[in-house]
Amino acid sequence: MKKFTLDEIDHQILDILIENARTPFTDIAKQLLVSAGTIHVRVKKMEDEGIIQGSTLSLNYEKMGYSFIAHVGVFLEKTSMTQAVIENLRKIPNVTVAYVTAGKYNIFCKVRAKGTNDAKDIIYEIDDVPGVNRTETMIALEESINDKKRMMHAIFKEL
């Protein structure tokens, strides 16, 4: 399979879209001194190659009343139950991230809640998932770094 290569214009397009995925192609074209058609064609090609996959919406959970963050380490009864447990965790909307891990926990989850009572109920719900042996919870005091943009910029500099 031939590797798709990005040139400097592609990098600049991606840099702009990383900062704001809703930037109009005409604005990008003006910044890069190319036509809007060029931007459209290049973005379409990057979408076709799977480099760009949709666009995302970022929410401010705190402003929506979900400022409490907990990380839950999940111990399974048997590792063969991993996929079934993951499928059940998908049904709990407050579980926003789940990783299958090697090490102390079988699964590691990020949970968003309104407060401690809400978090307690969510953790009990996780504990009740068939296949879960027990959990350990860590409460986040502050989300100090949550910046996917820096990683994306670093990757594009390597390409």
Across the structure, where does each feature detected by a protein language model lie?
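A compositional/biophysical signature of low hydrophobicity enriched in polar/charged and small residues
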Residues: 1-159
